[in-house]
Every structure is written in C-alpha cells, then in structure tokens.
Amino acid sequence: MTTLPPGLDPASVRAVAMDLDRTILADNLEFSPATVRAVGRLDDAGIAAIVATGRMFASARPYALQLGVTAPVICYQGALVADPHTGEWLLHRPMDVPLAHEVIEAVDAAGFHMNVYVDDRLFVEELNEEAVTYATHARLEAHAVGDLAAWLDRPTTKIVVVGQPEALDRLQDELRAHFDGRAFIAKSLPIFLELALPGVSKGSALEFVCERLGIDPDDVVAFGDGANDVELLEAAGLGVAVADADAALAPIAGWTVPSVDDDGVAGFLDALVDSRP
C-alpha cells in the first residue's frame, strides 16, 4: 500500500498533472495495466487527469485517449494546449521566425541534429539515424526538407536537439549562455534537448488549464521525472518526483514515488482515490 504525504488532504485534490515518458509511460512506450486502471479511476472520484508532456500533440493525443483523459493536454513543454477529443488548439505560443533561425544556426554550427515542429508536424534536414530514432519514439513520420533555416518561414512550436547525453549537457550550457533568457532550454530526456519561446513551460500551461477547468493550482498534484518538469511541480500544490528523476527535481518535489517500472504513480493514484471520503 502506497503511503500518501503527511499533511495531504485527499479530499482537497481536484486534479493530477502527469508527465508521460519515464513518469507513467515506460521505455517500451506502453502504459502498464496498473497505470491505465489507476488513471481511469480518477474521473469517478471527481479528479481531473491532465497530461503534461514535451511530446507533439499528434504524438501525445493517442496516449491521452488511451487513458480516457478529457482535460486539455499540455504538449510541447507547454507551448501548445489542445483538446484531446476535438483536436482544437486552446493555446499556442510558438517561436517567431527570427528566433527560430538563430536557434537553428547555433545548433547547426555545433554539429547536432535537430527537429523543427510546424503545424504539429515534424521536420528535419535529412532522415538520418537521429531522425529515425526520434520519429520511432514519437510514433510519427519525420519530413526531410533539406536546409532547415532556408526552409522555415513560419513560427515553430519548438526545436529539439538530439544527441548523446554528455554532449547535450555541454550544448545546453553553451546555448543558455548564448540566448541568455531569450529561449526556454531544458532536457526532456537525456538524449533530447528542447528549445521553445521564453516563458513557455509546463507550469505556465498548467495554470492555463486550471483556469479553464475552474481549479486552483494549489489543489493539483503533479508528477514528473525530468528537468523540464521543474516548473510543472512548482506550479502545483504538491510536486511528486519518481524515484529515478533528474536531480533538478530534488529541491522542488515534496514527495517521491517509485519509478515507472514499479508503477509508482499508479500506486499513489490508487491510494489517493481510496483515501477520499
């Protein structure tokens, strides 16, 4: 039986916000039966289930529907919020073309592969190993367009750099120094470095969704594993990290649960529902 945090009133929780990859979605890109059951119990308990992911909407939507989620889905690190059933975009905060061009040129000069997202489609320079790896992870098609800077003439929702973890750590430091707050920069997974409009985050998107649902963010429990989940956990009344989470979450999380492989979030959700009056 999972133990809930001391001081948490289960009856006060009105929503849970959940990252996907490595939080409730395993490395095999599947939900465990326990996770599907636990999330499915939330609606009957009067708790809204909110998916908050760095994934594209086209990639996240099937997962949200599999879980039976009806609340708006937070995608692209918070740059896009959309209705999982109608597909309507409720919020979109893309990077303008000049900023996107500057990012593309900086990443290209560093010699890394990158993905560019326009109109919820994935575009790459060429279909190389990195492009195929990402497209497989997202379960979507990548479109090769050649020179990305020359091709891009519209705002882009975000840009993702693909590479080895240590190399991306160094690039992240370089890009943060170069852009100096002019872009959101964070890792979603060890091999994915994400860049978006400054001010974009899962936390700001959670506040937007809560306002639409008439929920106080203080009445939300948020779950995450990555450095890109810091703002999500900060925005919620209670932030919960999985056991193998990025070290950046340690000072933010008010509670920890076992890893996705051990159904940590599912256990917490079951305990939460079972403890409500």
Language-model features and meaning:
Residues 106, 110-223, 227-231, 235:
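Conserved acidic, metal-coordinating active-site core of Asp-based
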Residues 35, 60-64, 171, 175, ...:
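Hydrophobic packing residues within well-ordered alpha-helices of enzyme cores
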Residues 3-15, 32, 194-277:
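Mg2+-dependent phosphoryl-transfer enzymes with acidic/Ser/Thr/Gly-rich catalytic loops
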Residues 67-69, 76-77, 179-181, 235-236, ...:
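Short, structured coil segments at secondary-structure junctions
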Residues 18:
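Active-site T/S-Asp motif of two-component receiver
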Residues 27-31:
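Conserved ATPase-coupling elements of RecA-like P-loop NTPase cores
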Residues 33-131:
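Active-site phosphate-binding/coordination module
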